[in-house]
Amino acid sequence: MDIFREIASSMKGENVFISPASISSVLTILYYGANGSTAEQLSKYVEKEENMDKVSAQNISFKSINKVYGRYSAVFKDSFLRKIGDKFQTVDFTDCRTIDAINKCVDIFTEGKINPLLDEQLSPDTCLLAISAVYFKAKWLTPFEKEFTSDYPFYVSPTEMVDVSMMSMYGKAFNHASVKESFGNFSIIELPYVGDTSMMVILPDKIDGLESIEQNLTDTNFKKWCNSLEATFIDVHIPKFKVTGSYNLVDTLVKSGLTEVFGSTGDYSNMCNLDVSVDAMIHKTYIDVNEEYTEAAAATSVLVADCASTVTNEFCADHPFIYVIRHVDGKILFVGRYCSPTTNC
């Protein structure tokens, strides 16, 4: 969650959407070629492939792909190549067709949601390009009925509101909790997809209460909040929305502790025969949330309620909120902030 916190704090008032799964995959590739303190810093982001396979095997459309493109004239070390296996391909970075081919690969894989990944021709000094793309599409276990979708005010701030298409369902059973913390009170609800993934939505009690929650959104806290959920009959209202994102993650990752990974400080002596540096890390994302399903992409996812009461509560996301798409084992696939209905739509 630390990467999301850094991006959110630097983009106040803007929608944010990232895929920790995709980011970790690229950092894992760098780890395989790193040495010394660079490898030590990257080690906490190492992604185990079986974790991704576990998600892919469920009854959802989830795909992940990692590709490593190396300069054809460079000599890459056998130990590095063994670790990345068939993900590696040599290319001519000075050929404009190389960029077109890479963009086409990502475009097809994400079903047209990320295009282009690379906007500019690469520098002739480029030695290696590592990309990771993930695609997720899943139907809600309990779909929203379109007849209940209507225009509804969304409060961007206590004094500003805009109309959104608000999806609604009534009297259904979902895992829900009202959480009270020293930094603020909020509600959290789990909206399951068919299969073993779900969307967690974190909604502050106060219209302007999201920032303090973001600042305290750690993996430990998030797990604690999820463990507090209880099955509840509840009316749910969340906006339909589409969000796209484009980020150069270098500054964010440096602030997150990767101080010896980028630029001249990085040690990638286990990668190839050249003195290489990582100068950019581009992360592009897309999400579409509607009545039937959630579709998400990134390049760099039957509750039986045992309720003692039939009193119906309400969860109305009519002001800024955080949403997390995760697997049942706790793996976070995507995390985002929705706060600006007039942008990224």
Curated annotation (Swiss-Prot):
Transmembrane segments: none annotated. The keyword ATP-binding does not apply. Its main location: host cell. It is found in: Host cytoplasm. It comes from the Viruses. One of its GO terms (molecular function) is serine-type endopeptidase inhibitor activity. GO terms for biological process: symbiont-mediated suppression of host apoptosis. The keyword Protein transport does not apply. Keywords: Host cytoplasm, Host-virus interaction, Inhibition of host caspases by virus, Modulation of host cell apoptosis by virus, Protease inhibitor, Serine protease inhibitor. The record marks D306, C307 as: Reactive bond. SUPFAM superfamilies: Serpins. One of its GO terms (cellular component) is host cell cytoplasm. Viral serpin that inhibits both cysteine and serine proteinases involved in the regulation of host inflammatory and apoptosis processes. Major anti-apoptotic protein which inhibits both intrinsic and extrinsic pathways and strongly cleaves host CASP1 and CASP8 but is a rather poor inhibitor of host CASP3. Prevents the proteolytic activity of host interleukin-1-beta converting enzyme (ICE) and ICE-like enzymes. Can also block apoptosis through host tumor necrosis factor (TNF) receptor. Belongs to the serpin family. Poxviruses subfamily. This is Serine proteinase inhibitor 2. It comes from Rabbitpox virus (strain Utrecht) (RPV). The gene is OPG199.
